């Protein structure tokens, strides 16, 4: 069974401050397929503070940097297509074709759309 008990906060995987686990149930089989940790108020606060700090520089990143990041993400997403599909099958009980073509496909399609729009319509703020 898959166990994911840490959170990705401020560029690192960190243990929850107040561990509290829950099973993820596959609705098709009604069996547990994973164990995850629930975030506490302190975990959420840490994540929000980290995001606020990151936005200080991300908010002024260049169009080229953002597009490069999205393109890298898109490439990695396609490489992990089967892993993403398998996770959707387990966590949502979705049939394989539906999970792959529609659910996994939607994430790829949205990312590709963000890239396309970024080339032509992205306006970024400048530092004052």
Predicted features along the sequence, with ranges:
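A short, hydrophobic C-terminal helix/tail in secreted or cell-surface proteins
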Residues: 123-128
């Amino acid at each position: 069974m898959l166990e994911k008990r840490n959170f990705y906060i401020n560029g690192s995987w960190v243990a929850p401050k107040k561990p509290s686990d829950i099973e993820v149930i596959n609705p098709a089989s009604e069996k547990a397929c994973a164990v995850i940790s629930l975030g506490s108020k302190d975990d959420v606060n840490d994540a929000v503070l980290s995001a606020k700090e990151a936005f200080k520089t991300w908010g002024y990143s260049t169009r080229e940097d953002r597009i490069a990041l999205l393109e890298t993400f898109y490439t990695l997403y396609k490489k992990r297509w089967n892993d993403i599909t398998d996770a959707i099958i387990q966590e949502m009980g979705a049939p394989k074709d539906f999970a792959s073509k529609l659910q996994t496909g939607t994430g790829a399609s949205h990312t590709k759309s963000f890239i396309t729009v970024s080339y032509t319509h992205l306006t970024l703020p400048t530092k004052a």
